[in-house]
C-alpha cells in the first residue's frame, strides 16, 4: 500500500497534465488587473480595488489545487484501465473524480465573473476620478475668476465717481455704505500690498494669497475689524448689483460718439482733397496728347504751351498729313526714308511752319495715285483710269514718273521729277531720262529689244517715234547716294525740271503715256540661254507702232559700274558700249557683254512688258488663258486703241488696221525666257504684262540722256 501510494504520488507528479488554459488565462488576467488597480486613488476607489484584488487571488489559488487533484485522479484512472491493482485510498480517490471536476469548473466560472466585475469597477473608478478632476478644475477656474473680479472692484473703488455712485445706489437704494467702503479699502491694502523691498516677492504675495483664499472660502477669521465671511458678503452684493456692467457700456458709448464725430471730419478732408488729383490728371492727358502729335513734325524745344491757338492749327495740319500718308498706296517694295528727312525744322513763324506742312503734303500727295492705278486691274483691255484722268500737256512738256522716296532737301524744292519722257511731234524720241537731284541716285538698267520684221510705212509724223534710252554719264550727282541696304527699294531721280510738271499728254501715243512702274518684288524665272543679253554697236532708229512684234527700240543705258547694285549682286556694266536685246536672235553674242547672266536674274519679261498699252499686255502675256492669242492665230486680234473709248484722250486712228503676227517668231521674244523653239505653247512667251522694256528697280543709279 505505501508503495502504491508513493507510486501514485510520484505518478501524479510526473504524469499530471498541465493546468488548463482557462486557469492560466485567469491568472494572467488577475495579474494584469492588479497593476491596473494600482491607480493612485483615495477613498472608496482604492479600497474596492484592493478587496477585488484579494478575492481574485483566493480564487486563483483554489483553482490551482483543484487542477492538481484532477490530474492525480486522471493518472489513477489510466492505471486502472491498464489492469494494475490500486490500493483502497487510490480507489476512493478515483471514486471522487466527478466531484473534483465539477468543483474545478465552478472555480473557473467564478474567476471569470470576478474578473469582469473587477474590470467594471476599474472603469467606474476612472470615470469617477475624471469627473472629480473636472469639478475641481471648474471650482478653481471659478475661484480664479472671482479673484480677478475682486481685484477689479477694489481698483475701481479708488475712483471718487464710483464711490459716489455706490453710495447713492440705483433707484435711490445705496449699494455700499461709507463704513463698508472703508473696510474694502483696508482689505485692498492686504490683498494688493505695496512692494516691500525687505521681503522677497514670493513671500510678500504668499501672504496676500492667503488673505484672498480666506476671503473666497468665507472663513470666520477676523480681518480689518471684521471677518472674511462678512467681506465676502459685501463683495458679492457689489457683483450682484451689476453696476460695473452698466458703467462699462456707458464708457463705450462715449468712445463711439467721439469716433463718429471724427469720421465726418476725415470725410470732409478727403472730399476737399479729391478734386485736385482729377484736375491734374486731365491736364496731364492734354499735354501728353499734344506732345505726341507735335513730336513727329516739330522739335520738342519749339513746343510752347502758351501758344495754344498755333499748336491747334499745327496739330490739325499734321494730322491731315498723316492721313494722306496712310491713304497713299504702297509700292511693291517701298523704301522707308530716314526720320529726319521727313521732319523739317520748324521755324519760329507759324506761317512758315504752315507753308512747310503744305509743301510736305504736296510732295506726299503728288502722283502716288498714278502708281496705284497702273498696278491694279492689268487684265482689263480698256484704258487706264489714270491715263484718262491725266492732265493734258504740251508735246514738248515732260511727263513725271513717280518717285518712291521724296525727302525734302531744300525748303523751296517740291517733289523731284524722275524719269521724264519728252514727246515731240516729228521724229520724236521718247527717252526715259533719269534725272537726279540732291541726295538721290537713280538705278534703272533698261533693255533695248529691237525687232525689224514687218515694219509698216509711217502714215503720220507721230508714228515716227524712236524710244531711246541712254545713260548720261555727264549728269552724275554731286551728292552721296543712299546706303546700299536701301538702294534696291529706292528709285531716285536727278536733275529737276519745272515744278508740278507731272501731267500726261493725252494726245501722245500709248507708248508716250506708258506707266513707268517698277515692280521689284516680281518673281524671277531662271535664265536658260547663254546669249541672254547681246550688244549692238549701232542703234536702230525706227519705232514701228504696228504692234506686229516688239516694234519700239529702246537704247540700252550705259551703266556705271561703281553705282549699279541690285538685290542679287553687283552689275558689272560697260560704260562705253550700250546693250540691246533683239527679239529675233539675229545678232551674234559678243565676248565683252556687260550683262552676266548669273548676276541679272531680274532682267525678265516682267521688267519689259510693263508700261505699254492695255492691249499689248494681254498680247505679250502668254500665261493669261486659252484665248490670249498664243494658242491660235493673231489675225483676229484688235487693239484696245482702235476705237475712241469714251472719256479717253486717245483718238489715234493708226491702230485701226488689223495686225499681222504671222512673221513673228515667238521662240525668243526675250532671251531670258527662251524655253524652246517653235510658235506653239506658252513656254516660249514671256511672263510680263506687256509694254516696252522697263528698268529694274534694284539698280542703285542710272543717268539717261537723249541719243541723236
Swiss-Prot record:
Residues 58-92, 123-151 form a coiled coil. Keywords: Acetylation, ATP-binding, Cell projection, Coiled coil, Cytoplasm, Differentiation, Glycoprotein, Methylation, Nucleotide-binding, Phosphoprotein, Protein synthesis inhibitor, RNA-binding. InterPro entries: Caprin (IPR028816), Caprin-1_C (IPR022070), Caprin-1_dimer (IPR041637). The modification Asymmetric dimethylarginine is found at residue 697. The modification Phosphoserine is found at residues 10, 113, 333, 341. One of its GO terms (molecular function) is ATP binding. It is found in: Cytoplasm, Cytoplasmic ribonucleoprotein granule; Cytoplasm, Cytosol; Cell projection, Dendrite; Cell projection, Lamellipodium. The modification Omega-N-methylarginine is found at residues 163, 624, 631, 638, 697. One of its GO terms (cellular component) is cytoplasmic stress granule. Tyrosine phosphorylation by EPHA4 promotes interaction with FMR1 and liquid-liquid phase separation (LLPS) for the formation of a membraneless compartment that concentrates mRNAs with associated regulatory factors. Ability to mediate liquid-liquid phase separation is regulated by ATP: moderate concentrations of ATP enhance phase separation, whereas high concentrations of ATP lead to inhibition of phase separation. Residues 1-48, 258-287, 415-459, 473-497, 521-559, 571-708 are annotated as: Disordered. GO terms for biological process: generation of neurons; intracellular mRNA localization; membraneless organelle assembly; negative regulation of translation; positive regulation of dendrite morphogenesis; positive regulation of dendritic spine morphogenesis; positive regulation of stress granule assembly; regulation of deadenylation-dependent decapping of nuclear-transcribed mRNA. Glycans are attached at residues 642, 648. Belongs to the caprin family. mRNA-binding protein that acts as a regulator of mRNAs transport, translation and/or stability, and which is involved in neurogenesis, synaptic plasticity in neurons and cell proliferation and migration in multiple cell types. Plays an essential role in cytoplasmic stress granule formation. Acts as an mRNA regulator by mediating formation of some phase-separated membraneless compartment: undergoes liquid-liquid phase separation upon binding to target mRNAs, leading to assemble mRNAs into cytoplasmic ribonucleoprotein granules that concentrate mRNAs with associated regulatory factors. The C-terminal disordered region undergoes liquid-liquid phase separation (LLPS) for the formation of a membraneless compartment that concentrates mRNAs with associated regulatory factors. CAPRIN1 molecules in the condensed phase are neutral. mRNA-binding promotes phase separation. Moderate concentrations of ATP enhance phase separation by reducing the electrostatic potential of CAPRIN1, thereby promoting intermolecular interactions. This is Caprin-1. The lineage of its organism: Eukaryota, Metazoa, Chordata, Craniata, Vertebrata.
